Amino acid sequence: MVANPGGGSTDAGGGPVRHIPVLLDEVLAALAPAPGKFILDGTFGAGGYSSAILAAGAEVIALDRDPTAIAAGQAMVAAHGGRLRLVHSQFSHLADHAPQGGLDGVVLDIGVSSMQIDEAERGFSFQKNGPLDMRMSAEGVSAADVVNRAKVADLIRIFHFLGEESQAPRIAHAIEKRRAEKPFETTRDLAGLIELVTPRKMKDKIHPATRVFQALRIFVNDELGELAQALFAAETALKPGGRLVVVTFHSLEDRIVKKFFSDRAGKASGSRHLPVAHERAATFEAVGKPMVSASEAEAEINPRARSAKLRAGLRTYAAAEAADMSLFGFPNLASLGKLGG
């Protein structure tokens, strides 16, 4: 994923950027790839993590929901003599692609890739004019569908929760007024309206469209739901001693990962306001520090690493728990299938 969408060369809303694997040394240390191990890279992208894992002698099953990434990676498949298998799939389905004996490791790098941002026709960037799309694959509802069809109340919830946008009501009402005259079709069209209606004092640090574009991208691709389901899937697919390593770039994503590992540590609630609960068997144990961030040296070389956070867990022998989405407390956002209904 690309951090800080909206400013300079590292934006999820801007660009261009050159893809450099973030926290690569730290990922490899937590993942511990070695000959004979099967590692699943849930976010193949440009193949940065997969390449390093292969260099350590492990076998790699790499997933990506973007068919262009899978097509671009075929030369890499040919170069590694059968040790790399590429699969067009969302990482929430990673358990479907695990070998029968289970996985030795899973690594997830959450969010949009620099390759997607660099292609104006994908509609991720407000600094590159293109169709208002933002889909990581060709399926499902586009950002234009959301902007042109969602109820104002739904737009406010989407912008506020997924983008942490304080001006969500102002922007949503401006969108409603403008789309009644002419629907939004391009990224620059939407970004221009947001810039027009956002108070000048809000424009100091980042482009005013940054948070709205982030929210739309996360919503269109169900990124938080995908992440949550991938964590549950990894719990099922990892063998005892297997490692789950997750790199996030946004506080919403990091909270989900932190909550998952905390819950799977099996400890009972310590709140004096709740009934005493028995401790559950931990399905994950900590690997290294609870959270690892990029060094100043890496951040200087690769600015997208500044907001990156790595969390990792070691799979125990305890049985996987049931996948319960209520663990994360997601709000009730608009249904993709009922926009404008």
Swiss-Prot record:
It is an enzyme of class 2 (transferase). Its EC number is 2.1.1.199. One of its GO terms (biological process) is rRNA base methylation. It catalyses: cytidine(1402) in 16S rRNA + S-adenosyl-L-methionine = N(4)-methylcytidine(1402) in 16S rRNA + S-adenosyl-L-homocysteine + H(+). Keywords: Cytoplasm, Methyltransferase, rRNA processing, S-adenosyl-L-methionine, Transferase. The keyword S-adenosyl-L-methionine applies. S-adenosyl-L-methionine binds at G47, G48, Y49, D64, F91, D109, Q116. GO terms for molecular function: rRNA (cytosine-N4-)-methyltransferase activity. SUPFAM superfamilies: Putative methyltransferase TM0872, insert domain, S-adenosyl-L-methionine-dependent methyltransferases. It is found in: Cytoplasm. The keyword Secreted does not apply. One of its GO terms (cellular component) is cytoplasm. Pfam families: Methyltransf_5. It comes from the Bacteria. Belongs to the methyltransferase superfamily. RsmH family. HAMAP family: 16SrRNA_methyltr_H. Specifically methylates the N4 position of cytidine in position 1402 (C1402) of 16S rRNA. This is Ribosomal RNA small subunit methyltransferase H. It comes from Rhizobium johnstonii (strain DSM 114642 / LMG 32736 / 3841). The gene is rsmH.
